[in-house]
Amino acid sequence: MPRIILIATFYETIDSIKHHLSAVGVQNVQSIIDNGSLLIIDSFSSYYPDIDGMKKLVATLSERARKEGRAGVTAIVDMGFFFMFGGDGRATELINYEASLAPKTEGYNVKGFSCYHGGNFSTLKDNQKKELVQKGKKLLDVTESTITY
């Protein structure tokens, strides 16, 4: 069975994510959601009021994937929540949160991608950016979209 895909959006609506997926050729998006292979959620509700809510959700999905004989979970998560109120305290909270995420999971077969809006990422100091890519994590900087509709 296919992996469970989790898309946690912050700046886009759930409907716009469905539309974008359809526009780039993903067929039958709603049926993929209905069969449990795709979850699209608002990331705010997964971080607030419990900052570890996203971790708990991914762990639950990972266990479900194991029980269903799936290959695992891929989580694509917009980290915009951590920039919502601004200030250095939130950057520290973000860095601590990212540091708590293992680059490789043992037994869960989870692949995670933390996504940052360029405007948010540029507000971080150089040393904060370096801290985010510590412990075997990698940074992919996508600066331009070539998707046209």
Predicted regions and their residues:
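Non-catalytic regulatory/interaction regions at protein termini and inter-domain linkers
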Residues: 1-149
